Amino acid sequence: MKSYKKILPLFSIALLVILLYFSDLPSVVDVLLKTNMFLISIALVILVASVFIRIVRWKLFLKNLNIDSTWGECSYSYMPALFLSNFTPARVGEPIRSYFLKKMKGVSMSKTIPSVIVERAMDVISLVILGVFILFTFNLGYIVYVDVFLIILVIIIGIALLRNERVAGRIFGVFFRIFSFHPRLKDAKRRREEITERFHSGFRIKKSILSVVFILSLLIWVSEGIIFYLAFLSIGVELSLFLITSIFAFSILMGVITFLPGGIGSTEFVFALILSSYIPLSQATAGIILGRFLTFWIIMFIASFFWRKV
């Protein structure tokens, strides 16, 4: 397992090195030096709005659970989890925000984890909606269609199973048996029915809130698509917003499928591969570097400050 964790970051670095090599690094640097900083500043404003929408979405989930949380509590439970989860494959570390919330308010993790699961499902569905259009532009092979279909199928089946209290109880039963050696889980095993009920209640989301959350999820990813559009525009590349957003969403999905931490390497590689059909690879890579810096690395930088204070 440890060797597996070491290989993934190395694979990410290797993909980035290969991309930069074939993009002609001096040409990429030359393109980046001509960046229009005014457009980048507009992108930063949109980025701040995108982060705020993420926190609003989390607050809505907590409101659905009748958890009275301040904006500070929402931020300090969400942002550190975002920072840590980006180091995990497919951001599977997201549920740690439930731990941070428990640490601050004493709220049971089993009560809030379902909201995190639904939120991640909304993200993936939003990305599929935005990214599916690019599939019809290129003959990307049947395996891509199969992967996207399997992602949606797993999400639907997974949520359907977890919403079933009996199934959830059995899953917890297996979990507690496997990890019964842990002293804290021994106590939790005795409260399995109580934990299962809390977990199951977390999936009872009002339709009105679920609809708003879905719209917010779409808005988050569209705003990040706009940031990429501005990044390309800032280096003199004029492509349609629709095209950039669709390729961006599809690339993020492919990054999730590869299970590389934060999708680093795989997202950029797929993005550049598709975009090189429209513009020179050096311009594609330069725009992607700018876009990823704005939508990923700056968010990581901001989130790290919240992490230090938790």
Which residues are covered by each model-predicted region?
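Transmembrane helix-loop-helix hairpins in multi-pass inner-membrane proteins
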Residues: 1-33, 81-185, 260-310
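Membrane-embedded helical hairpins/re-entrant loop segments and their flanking transmembrane helices
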Residues: 55-78, 231-247
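Alpha-helical transmembrane segments and their immediate interhelical loop/hinge regions
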Residues: 189-234
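Juxtamembrane helix-entry segments on the extracytoplasmic side of multipass membrane proteins
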Residues: 32-42, 142-151, 204-211
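Alpha-helical transmembrane segments of MFS and MFS-like solute carriers/permeases
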Residues: 42-46, 212-219, 251
